[in-house]
Amino acid sequence: KSLVDRAGPRTGSVSAYCSLVLVLVQVLVLVHPAAGYSLDQEHSLEFSGPPSSMFGYSVLLHRHGAHSWLVVGAPVANSSSSPSVRSPGAIYRCSITAESRHYVLNCGKTCDAESDHQWLGVSLSRQPGDNGGHILACAHRWKNVYYSKKEGQNHKLPNGVCYRYANDLRHPQPIIPCYRDHQRKFGEDYGSCQAGISNFLTEDLIIMGAPGTSYWTGSVLVFNTSSGGMSVYLDDDAGAVSFGSYLGYAVGAGHFLSPGTVEVLGGAPQYNQKGKVRPTFVAICLSLGSYFGSSVCAVDLNADGLSDLLVGAPMATGITREEGRVHVYINQGQAKLLEAGFQLIGSDAYAARFGETIANLGDLDDDGYPDVAVGAPQEDDLKGAVYIYNGRKEGISPTPSQRITGSTLGRDLRMFGQSLSSGIDIDDNGYQDVAVGAFLSDSAVVLRTRPVIQVKASVALPEQIDQRVALCREHKTPTVCLNVTVCFSVRSRQFRGAIDLQYNLTSDLLHKPSFPHRFYFHGNGVTHSHVRDIFTPVKFEVSYNHRETNTHKASSKTFPPLKPILQQSAGHQNTITNQTWFARSCSLVNCSTNMQLSAQLVLPDQQQYFALGSGQTIMLKTSLLNSGDDAFLPRLTLRFPNNIHYIKVLQSCLTDGEVILISVAIYAFTASAIFCQLSSCFRKQRLYCVLPAKPCLCSSYLCRIIVCASYVKYVSLVDVCDWSCCANTASFM
């Protein structure tokens, strides 16, 4: 004859400048990565119980008046008041102060029934309420003993017992929901129902799991404290009932049909060896042996007034073994739960049993959506870990915002994450705190929640960048520039004090690798020319964080103040972007140009031909007219005989009325051609590109000299060259 057992390893302003052709990005501030998120790991509180008592198997934060308590279950602890009882278990009330004290809660006369190994403290729950409601503590292996005269022997029926404590943690009232005077047979009906292996309290309901009902088919027992009536929920799907399903292994309640109704949850992790959850709908896991339904949590993830559902499958196996999963179901209304397209997996670590426990933490990060904690108590060779997930408008983030282990707390803990509790603000800073049990090290830890700072940032840019308008001067040169204004607004629900923000502004994020950056920050002392890429938008990015802020006012007389954290918005990590465009004066979306090119050869003495040896220089005057929309990135290609070599652009031809030379840059050349980049934007105007070419005969070879505007570059010297013939040319360069 077996019993169900839960034990064991199972604001600022910045100016950026655009020179008519320049680019450089400068990082302003080094941003440090954010530390641990909502839960503070530096000032954790640890509580220890008797050795080998499994102290921490269940935990519960509780508050009554001005007093905050950590209630801890130690299901195999010995009783100091009844030394003859073997390992009955105990409930400890720990005062959360600088000097913690433990008190053992008395369970009353009912303990006089056989309480050996009853596992008092296997489950704990609290009635909701700001000032703390009743507490329920259960011992699912408590046995009802009766003597059969007919058989001449005692019979022990593991009915299970729960104790309901007042909010001052006194005057326990026993509840034995499975006791029946006529019950005599172990396993049959409620003879071994093991009530209380799990429990959950609402304002009016006491919900207890009884997985041993009817040969471990299981049931969920609901006691209405207002009417005094008891209801029993079995699996009413007659075709699906199977012995050993363990319905009631986990229980809960939520608002699934409507915000004004309460529906009860019951998990059956052994249903067909796959697992099942049954509120007003049925969820069945297809993974064999996953223990789907061994933990359940009803929580309104998307803040729509209806409860969504998280179901743990801690023995689900992925690549290795028993990594564990949590299934997510989003309420579509009227208890129509749609499973999300992903599962929560933690670190997907070997034998972690992620999903063993799930707890609703309330809104830790002030974004309006509840957050949850998931325990993986066997991760890292039974050391354990706890993962924090944040609720979102669409449901829940699939990635945890925080991972907490015993080592990150500086403590040697084992089975950390076996139990979780929240719902109470122990330090009066306006945020609910979290308790975590680690029963293999007989410990429990309380983690306080850090206050949240909400920062809204914006980047203001001009709508367009007009290259014709030079609003700034750089090195006494008119320069095209734009102002980038970064603004921050800061708000906190609880924190009061100065906030030290640091931010990093990056420009031109979308620049193409084949082009240089187009912008630089004022004062760099670096300039370029020829901005060629004017089609790609100019994108700016601001990432920000806060320096560690010293808090001067404690949140209570007992606890040191906690440093605030920045709220992490969904979709990005404190990063915003904005972009602007280069202005294009086009009548249509796609510019329609009308480029007309003419060229005239200017020979010495106005001759019609040029005889080799009759002179050293000839000129080619090119005229380019655009009578349509603005042309962007125009290029001019000139080809000439091999014995003529390009020298430079003459500046004397640039004052001919309205004729304007925007800029000329050689970006490629061959022995018989040059390729000029005229300008990034060629508007409705003429361009004269005058190119003198001087044949310089040097022992039948040529001196090759390439000149573009005022930039001179000696490209190559063919064989041996007589430089005397090039002296005049070199002098005027």
Predicted regions and their residues:
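Conserved beta-strand/short-helix segments
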Residues: 3-687, 696-700, 704-710, 716, ...
